Amino acid sequence: MEQFECINVEEAHQKLHQQTAVLVDIRDPQSYAMGHTPGAFHLTNDTLGAFMRDHDFDTAVMVMCYHGNSSKGAAQYLLQQGFDKVYSVDGGFDAWHRHFPAEVAHGTF
């Protein structure tokens, strides 16, 4: 995959539950703590190294932000770092929360 692919929250939900991709959330720590997708890895400048050590480059990665804009830049960056399959989640956490309100975790873990 030379370019990331945009997917909707339904596709992201399916990939997450089928465990065919991991989800990273790039929002600020306060927004992440107030609510995030269960199982999402909070990807920041400080956690990037750990994420890259813990995941093989052939791991499919879905990137989520607030509304689906910032995730595109982060998705492109992950491709440049060597990840093979990267997706940007259209609509971001805002769309996830609207479509799957019962699937929102709170806190930093």
Swiss-Prot record:
Its EC number is 2.8.1.1. Keywords: Cytoplasm, Transferase. It is found in: Cytoplasm. It catalyses: thiosulfate + hydrogen cyanide = thiocyanate + sulfite + 2 H(+); thiosulfate + [thioredoxin]-dithiol = [thioredoxin]-disulfide + hydrogen sulfide + sulfite + 2 H(+). The active site is at C65 (cysteine persulfide intermediate). CDD domains: GlpE_ST. This is Thiosulfate sulfurtransferase GlpE. It comes from Klebsiella pneumoniae (strain 342).
